Amino acid sequence: MEKRLFTSESVSEGHPDKVADQISDAILDAMLKKDPNSHVACETIVTTGMVFVFGEISTSAYVDIQDVVRKTILKIGYDRPELGFDGNNCAVMVDIDEQSPDIADGVDHSLETRENKSDNDELDQIGAGDQGLMFGFAIKETPELMPLPISLSHRLMRRVASLRKDHTLEWLRPDAKAQVTVEYDENGKPLCVDTVVISTQTDAEVSNEEICRAMIDLVIKEVIPAKYLDENTKFLINPSGRFVIGGPKGDSGLTGRKIIVDTYGGYARHGGGAFSGKDPTKVDRSASYAARYVAKNIVAAGLAYRCEVQLAYAIGVAHPVSIMIDTAGTGTVDDELLTEAVRNVFDLRPAGIIKMLDLRRPIYEQTAAYGHFGRTDVDLPWEKTDKTQALLDYIKNNQ
């Protein structure tokens, strides 16, 4: 019988697209630290020897963008010329415009307030920064309620970075990728890890044998629980044979090109909007966080084994145009009642999300590598499960 396999990938903080994400979010954090009401849409391109920062920003803060860019690159580990990219001497170009006044007006004065339909509710005043659809997801495959393939992929990449930064493996360089294939049983429960792929940038002098031995013994076997590994698990370590040239010298990087790595590894649907470089009035980011918060609390409350949440917005309108809950038949109550409970327990207007999750803070750079969801190494407000009792109470009182 054909195996039921599912694969997800992660990339390291030194991957060129992730370098761009971290620069964009470092700039966002610097703005929010000085002016919590900053409106930021910051994009970054990185390529050999050069960084280009552009976008639309409206803020009362002054931020030395070039300094933020260089410090971010150096912190990642691109700190010497032989890596092909060096934060000390790369060119940094900046082209920032103000946010469109048309968009700003729609965000600051929602349709509800313009049509006097807000009942003087201050949380009605902010409209969504754009139209769009966003998804959130949670599943009981891991303690952090994430799909197992993406969870393991992120953990592998964090482990590789740790071994590089603490100098256990002096020959590691910043760029790396991991991919994990998990076999599932007929009920959709994980059985074992079928294949692990790790491609990691290294110095030229290290042998393929040493790389393989280190990745298997110090990374894979330290990260993946033994119950998921057996004699049939396949390990593919630097399968291209050589990975010395990497980072922005090997490939150009651009903000927002790793949206599946950032979320659920393809296990759940994605609305298409990227996160990094966007302030929380952009629902691409804040509503995706809220959707994860909703889904995680539903699963944590024992109301479903898995849950996918879709939210949708119209530009300049405060209230979501739609809310959808899909538990794929695993819910203990029907999805319509769960949707009703969500409407009553969670405030999913942009200003409501910002208040509920306290999003006008400089907390975003830490999300720009190794995933925005299921993080156990940093404290993120949308990962809290503090709404479980409110959901259970609503269900109990309305069944």
From Swiss-Prot:
Keywords: ATP-binding, Cytoplasm, Magnesium, Metal-binding, Nucleotide-binding, One-carbon metabolism, Potassium, Transferase. Residues 99-109 are annotated as: Flexible loop. CDD domains: S-AdoMet_synt (cd18079). ATP binds at H15, D175, A176, K177, R242, F243, D251, R257, K258, A274, K278. GO terms for cellular component: cytoplasm. It is found in: Cytoplasm. Mg(2+) binds at D17. Binds 2 divalent ions per subunit. K(+) binds at E43. One of its GO terms (molecular function) is magnesium ion binding. Homotetramer; dimer of dimers. HAMAP family: S_AdoMet_synth1 (MF_00086). This is S-adenosylmethionine synthase. It comes from Lactobacillus acidophilus (strain ATCC 700396 / NCK56 / N2 / NCFM).
